[in-house]
Amino acid sequence: MTIAEEFATRNFSIYGQWTGVVCILLCFALGIANLFHVSLLIIFSALCLVSSFLIIFIEIPLLLRICPTSSTFDTFMRRFTTNYMRAAIYMGMAIVQWLSIIIDASSLIAAAVLLTIAAGFYALAGLKGQGFVGSKTLGGQGVAQMIL
């Protein structure tokens, strides 16, 4: 199934997963860019950077198979297999970035907006009763099992 065919299914979990991939790039870039502030904004930029690495393992299940991680980390990551749990973690990460406005308005707002959109897609998928469907392009639905 191509990416276009995946989007044509109108499953909001696919939209959420691909928005999550964009969040990986944006959180990584903005986390690094805002590390050079000489204020408490450094804390929020470090949390944004950590969020990008969490999202990598949440959205690309293939990495849990090929990267050496602890069983505790694997168990933690496997909690986020449902739409509601993914919506919850994305909303949690978004709230942290929205709180960065307290310190100073910065480009971290873009990360907060995109994380909120991803949480919204996953929440809509859950509310519509759509099961979580992982993108084949990102290692879902059988690709990760082919490595073993």
Curated annotation (Swiss-Prot):
Bilayer-crossing residues are 12-32, 38-58, 85-105, 107-127
Specify the superkingdom: Eukaryota
Provide this UniProt record's keywords sorted from A to Z.
Glycoprotein, Golgi apparatus, Membrane, Transmembrane, Transmembrane helix
The primary site where this protein sits is Golgi
| Membrane topology listed for this record | Multi-pass membrane protein
Q: Name one GO biological process term.
A: vesicle-mediated transport
Task: List, alphabetically, the InterPro entries matched.
Answer: TVP18/Ca-channel_flower
Cellular component per GO, a single term: Golgi membrane
Q: Which residues are glycosylated?
A: 11
- Pfam families, per the entry: Cg6151-P (PF10233)
Q: Write out the annotated subcellular location.
A: Golgi apparatus membrane
Write out the similarity annotation: Belongs to the TVP18 family.
Query: What job does the chain carry out?
Result: Golgi membrane protein involved in vesicular trafficking.
User: Which named protein is this?
Assistant: Golgi apparatus membrane protein tvp18
